Amino acid sequence: AETYAIIWNDNSFQIRATPQELYEVINLKYALSYALDNIGQDLTEEMIVHIAVMINRNIAAISGYRTGQVYIRGAEHIPPAPDMVRNEMVRFIDSCCRTEYRDIFDKLADTHLQFECIHPFEDANGRAGRVLLTYELLHNKYFPIVIPKEERANYFAYLASQNRIGLAEFFQALYEREIARAQKFGYQF
């Protein structure tokens, strides 16, 4: 409810959050707005970096790809060395724009796993990756998905195990829930 209140400028909620949590949600709002403004364009490095910069505003000084080695908590995978990040991101963007996939959910799972494995920024890679999920769905004329709090453990398990098929099925199930929810509000598909 608090995230909703901040994103939609709803002042009817009393917010009990730390300054960092507030910045995270406010920054997410601006990053999503930027992604929506660019929905008609193919994904570029500049867009991805701009999203990461926006997500980290007032939290961490991010101006581009990371310059140090990072490790992902709970994962066995070690992201590439900093000097390899740009090349990996070029490959990632090529996958997003040119690779043929079985369906949108397979594409989302594959590219999301690629992005999270690259871990291109010092901080907020998860939030940036989820903004990119929303961008990719909307860019391909699909409803966006939301990963509910009670489903986060499943989401992180798919990431940690690099389970592309499971993650694709997870995204598809979330999408189907969003469609059902939208239909309750009168949207027709």
Region locations from a protein language model:
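FIC/Doc superfamily catalytic core
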Residues: A1-D123, R127-F189
